[in-house]
Curated annotation (Swiss-Prot):
Protein name, per record: Uncharacterized protein ORF60
Organism ancestry: Viruses, Viruses incertae sedis, Bicaudaviridae, Bicaudavirus
Example of a GO biological process term: regulation of DNA-templated transcription
Gene3D superfamilies: Met repressor-like
Protein's organism: Acidianus two-tailed virus (ATV)
Amino acid sequence: MMKEVSFKAEEDLLVLLDRYAMKYKLNRSEAIRKAIEKMLRDELAKEPTPVARVENSSLS
C-alpha cells in the first residue's frame, strides 16, 4: 500500500519534472517515485557493503 507524501518544489523544478513525465508518458507521482528510487539506489551503491564478522568460540 502506498502512503501519500507531499512537499514543496520550486517552479523550475516542476517544469523539469513535467517535461520528464511527458517524455516518458508518466504522471508526476510516477516520475517522482522513479527519480527518488534512482537517487537512493545510486547513492546506496556507492557505500561499501558491510561485512559480517563471525567469531567461532570452539576454536579458542
